Amino acid sequence: MNENVLIVAAHPDDEVLGCGGVIAKHIDDNDNVSVVFMADGVESRNYQDFESNISDRKTHALKACSILGVNNPIFLNFPDNRMDSIPLLDVIKSIEKIIDKLSPTIIYTHNDSDLNIDHRITYQAVMTSCRPQQGSSIKKIYLFEVLSSTEWSLSSYGSFVPNCFVDITNFIDVKIDALNEYLYEINEFPHPRSVEAVKALAK
């Protein structure tokens, strides 16, 4: 039976860095995959032309998702790196509406120890939205690693200790192709957000 898969990413680029290969694998398995972006990923960067850069980032996100095989990602447009300024209940309700509409069987989202505040709030909101209740469609929840956020977490947040691994050997190239849509996030090796580091983590 095909799965309904929901990716809840804090920002455009997190979906590729965190689970781009897994997304492509689900698509190859004929699963239904939806992607939700919680924050716009622009505001904290102090761009002068704010609206134009939001539009530009969305364009790149649409292209990246298309490369992975996902159509019509959802943009919730919470403020970048300021999701802690939004009442948590509002964030939870926005996710609950999407879950009610899409009835996902599998959800992927951030780890709770990530350094980035939006990642941690996204995790908290997703886990609250997925609390066990009668009639829930959700069977599995997976947390993914995002380079330069997960491994840079403070010790007080705990650490990411993965216990599930997926072979994406056949999908690493499409992951990199999608990542190249976010060129402003790619750095030179040995920075963790370099093509070489992303490939190394996938091995």
Region roles according to the model:
Residues 7-17:
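Short, glycine-rich nucleotide/cofactor-binding loops
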Residues 39, 43-71:
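Short, surface-exposed acidic-centric catalytic microdomains
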Residues 17-39:
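Histidine-anchored nucleotide/phosphate-binding helix
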Residues 17-18, 56, 90:
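Short, conserved clusters of charged catalytic residues that mark active-site
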Residues 1-8, 25, 29, 49-52, ...:
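Metal-dependent de-N-acetylase/amidase catalytic core
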Residues 18-19, 44, 123, 174:
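Hydrophobic positions within alpha-helical membrane elements
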Residues 14, 42-44, 82, 150:
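Flexible, glycine-rich phosphate/dinucleotide-binding loops
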Residues 10, 38-40, 146:
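Cofactor-binding loop segments of dinucleotide-utilizing enzymes, especially the Rossmann-like FAD-
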